[in-house]
């Protein structure tokens, strides 16, 4: 098993979603997205820096391949999972007042909270755009629609998990049951979705 085989095609797919917009206005918005994804520095000059382990999209592609599916056909969904994950990180940094992410200043510390919120919203929309690129491949429409339904359901779970997490900050003690509900939704849901979508797109029931 070699997950590294997925990384370059995944990066290419993500860039195919984001890069065409990077030359459009407003340059600040797409510059911030490129910065957060590790493709640009603070002046928006091209760089390539550490941008995370990419575990979730790799799990999706691995699950697809394990079920006998052509993993390259699932690349749009893998890119969507990673873009969605990064959307949650942008908003999480704001909500938790985190000043650094992956060794660099976070978006809100550089460009302010309102711009960072807006950049996160844009990344959320781009994640859906990535999912819709499945329609350009050979996958049957009913399978793509089911994948979109599972994807949307998972996003709601993520927001529920974040609600728990934020509420816990005001509590001195947290009971076991709500804590498990929080980590199930906030931490586990994207990993589970990645594996589920990989199998689903390969044709598994």
Feature annotation, model-predicted:
Residues 1-80, 84, 90, 94-109, ...:
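Conserved N-terminal diphosphate/IPP-binding helix and adjacent helical/loop segment
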Residues 1-4, 152, 184:
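Short amphipathic alpha-helical segments with heptad-repeat character
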Residues 48, 101-123, 172-187:
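Divalent-cation-assisted or electrostatically stabilized phosphate/pyrophosphate-binding catalytic cores
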Residues 59, 127, 161:
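Residue-level signal for inorganic ion chemistry
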Residues 66-70, 130-148, 165-182, 196-205:
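Inter-helical turn/loop segments and adjacent helix faces that build the functional surface
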Residues 74-98, 149, 155-157, 188-192, ...:
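Active-site alpha-helical segments that house and flank conserved acidic catalytic motifs
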Residues 110-111, 117, 121-139, 149:
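A glycine/threonine-rich phosphate-anchoring loop and its flanking beta-alpha core
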Residues 114, 118, 154, 158-162:
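Mid-bilayer segments of alpha-helical transmembrane spans in multi-pass integral membrane proteins
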């Amino acid at each position: 098993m070699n997950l590294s085989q997925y990384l370059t095609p995944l990066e290419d797919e993500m860039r195919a979603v984001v890069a065409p917009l990077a030359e459009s206005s407003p340059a600040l918005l797409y510059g911030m997205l490129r910065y957060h994804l590790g493709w640009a520095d603070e002046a928006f000059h091209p760089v390539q820096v550490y941008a995370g382990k990419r575990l979730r999209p790799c799990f999706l592609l691995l699950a697809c391949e394990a079920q006998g599916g052509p993993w390259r056909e699932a690349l749009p969904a893998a890119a969507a999972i990673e873009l969605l994950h990064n959307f949650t990180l942008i908003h999480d940094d704001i909500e938790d007042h985190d000043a650094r992410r992956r060794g660099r200043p976070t978006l809100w510390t550089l460009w302010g909270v309102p711009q960072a919120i807006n950049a996160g919203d844009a990344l959320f929309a781009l994640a859906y755009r990535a999912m819709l690129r499945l329609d350009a491949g050979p996958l049957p429409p009913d399978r793509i629609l089911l994948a979109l339904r599972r994807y949307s359901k998972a996003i709601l779970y993520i927001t529920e998990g974040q609600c728990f997490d934020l509420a816990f900050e005001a509590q001195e003690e947290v009971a076991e049951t709500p804590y498990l509900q929080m980590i199930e939704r906030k931490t586990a849901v994207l990993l589970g979705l990645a594996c589920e979508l990989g199998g689903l797109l390969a044709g598994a029931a």
